[in-house]
Design a protein with these regions (language model features):
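Conserved catalytic-core segment of nucleotide-activated headgroup transferases in glycan assembly
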Residues: 1-67
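Alpha-helix boundary/N-cap detector
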Residues: 36-39, 154-157, 176
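Short, surface-exposed amphipathic charged segments that create phosphate/polyanion-binding patches used
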Residues: 2-8, 91-96, 148-155
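A short acidic, often aromatic-flanked loop/helix-cap motif at beta-alpha or helix-coil junctions
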Residues: 1, 65, 82-87, 141-148
Length: 189
């Protein structure tokens, strides 16, 4: 039973940086930046919460272990409820999470966050932000600089192109996923 979610939330689409297991698979270890990363992220999320008078909800990465890493300063953390929170969100914040697709499909404002500690992750952030016509938000900027940023802008043309290029082949096809799978299987057999 999912609680009533209204657009009172700012949703952070978490990628479990710097603990994400994929880094270990490629021989990278970014745990040394954890304290600085989470300190800066919390300062920024508190800023954005105050600016818009909205609660920040962390939509945790499915493999996150925040029961081991108490890093979000008492912010609400939800697991496996990302779509529901994005659907009712005011804005979404991320680095380059694949769950950004939910925000695009649902036409939600997205801001792509960067800080110098995650230089190793700048390329994917740049790529997704650019494809959606968004500038990257450097959370190391001063409050006066951050105050100038429009966090609620949506570029409809870029969102539609992103959907066509990266999410679906045919936006006119209104069948659900399983109807498409069944039709493709029937063609083959």
């Amino acid at each position: 039973n999912i609680e009533d979610i209204s657009s009172k939330y700012i949703v952070y689409l978490d990628e479990y940086l710097p603990y994400h297991g994929d880094f270990a698979l490629v021989g990278e270890n970014h745990i040394k930046i954890a304290d600085t990363y989470y300190k800066k992220m919390n300062i920024f999320l508190d800023y954005i919460s105050k600016r818009y008078d909205k609660e920040v909800v962390i939509c945790a990465h499915p493999r996150s272990e925040y029961h081991k890493h108490k890093v979000w300063n008492n912010k609400k953390i939800v697991l496996f409820e990302t779509y529901n929170y994005v659907k009712q969100s005011f804005i979404c914040l991320t680095h380059a999470s694949t769950s950004t697709n939910f925000a695009v499909i649902l036409n939600k404002p997205i801001s792509f966050l960067y800080l110098k500690e995650i230089e190793f992750y700048k390329f994917p952030i740049d790529a997704v932000a650019h494809s959606l016509g968004k500038n990257i938000v450097d959370i190391d900027l001063s409050k006066s600089e951050l105050d100038k940023i429009d966090f609620v802008n949506v570029n409809q043309t870029k969102y539609q192109k992103y959907i066509e290029d990266y999410i679906t082949e045919n936006t006119e096809d209104k069948r659900n996923f399983w109807e498409n799978v069944l039709q493709e299987l029937e063609k083959e057999y």
